Amino acid sequence: MKSSIVAKLEALQERHEEVLAYLGDASVIADQDRFRALSREYAQLTDVTRCFKEWRSAQDDIEAAEMMLDDLEMREMAQEELKIAKARSEELEQQLQVLLLPKDPDDERDCFLEIRAGTGGDEAAIFAGDMFRMYSRYAETRRWKVEIMSASEGEHGGYKEVIAKISGDGVFGQLKFESGGHRVQRVPETESQGRIHTSACTVAVMPAIPEAELPEINAGDLRIDTFRSSGAGGQHVNTTDSAIRITHIPTGIVVECQDERSQHKNKAKAMSVLGARIRAAEMQKRQLAEASERRNLLGTGDRSDRNRTYNFPQGRVTDHRINLTLYRLDEVMEGKLDMLIQPIVQEYQADQLSALSEQD
């Protein structure tokens, strides 16, 4: 391992001890925001320092085994020990490289999850509902909170569009690779001939940014319309114009919110989603520029992005970005998403490592 990397790891080890001391300080404990931030940093540093200690232990084992090679009686055993220690050292070095990759500052944030029905009419809306249920189940397994911000229900079930805020530890970092197009192949309940139909929906995952960090939105750039809240089939939820539609004129971004009875609450929710969408659009531009010369696994939420196909007759789900196919569709739809998320996270990390080595 490069001496510069070892020096960086030694500095992180010192920081780990420093943060531990802070966490025992009464003034830090009294400041909940600082205590929470330091606790997160401590957890991240703990993984790095543990791995670094194990790597150093492997180096000691290599050194000891090499010294034993000169002893004829011990040589065979020493060669075996050297082989094991070197393999362990290489494995730990790879783990350390991943742990040292630049962290996306948004990874620890909550997120907004948007699911929109695409081609396929009623079946697309039903599939969007199935997708929302899948993500909600996944959130339950990770003890995350799901709050619907806005929903437009389909006439025969599901959603034309649903926006939810998902809160918890590391939500955006875990879900950000879900952005893009999702396609379903199955026989709709309304299909009398038993023919397989293809429908689609798009998913967009955006970090939920605190109000103070959101891009400044000029009030003159907004058109705000109020209308009467309605449920599926036009049935009125209430008789006041409490629903809000906000249009950001420069970008054409439109956000509707009608889930709350209070117009003020609907406007606050809509503004938070609008701010996240504007920021996400800016980030997307930047990502496209940076990724022009290499593939980008981070979906843009664009309809042209084809992330996955969910084939119900075959019980198959395929992630087209990494050519991964699993015949475990029932489990996936019940929210067991780690089997799909982890491989793409690993692929993304491998791409990052490759990009860093090219810079070196």
UniProtKB/Swiss-Prot annotation:
Record note on modification: Methylated by PrmC. Methylation increases the termination efficiency of RF1.
Keyword Protein biosynthesis on entry: yes
Biased composition (Basic and acidic residues): 291-308
GO cellular component labels: cytoplasm
Keyword flag Metal-binding: no
Keywords from the UniProt entry: Cytoplasm, Methylation, Protein biosynthesis
GO molecular function annotations of the record: translation release factor activity, codon specific
Compartmental location: Cytoplasm
Positions carrying N5-methylglutamine: 235
Disordered: annotated span: 291-312
Pfam families per the UniProt record, alphabetical: PCRF, RF-1
Stated role: Peptide chain release factor 1 directs the termination of translation in response to the peptide chain termination codons UAG and UAA.
Protein family per UniProt: Belongs to the prokaryotic/mitochondrial release factor family.
PANTHER family tied to this protein: LD18447P
The protein's name: Peptide chain release factor 1
Organism: Yersinia pseudotuberculosis serotype I (strain IP32953)
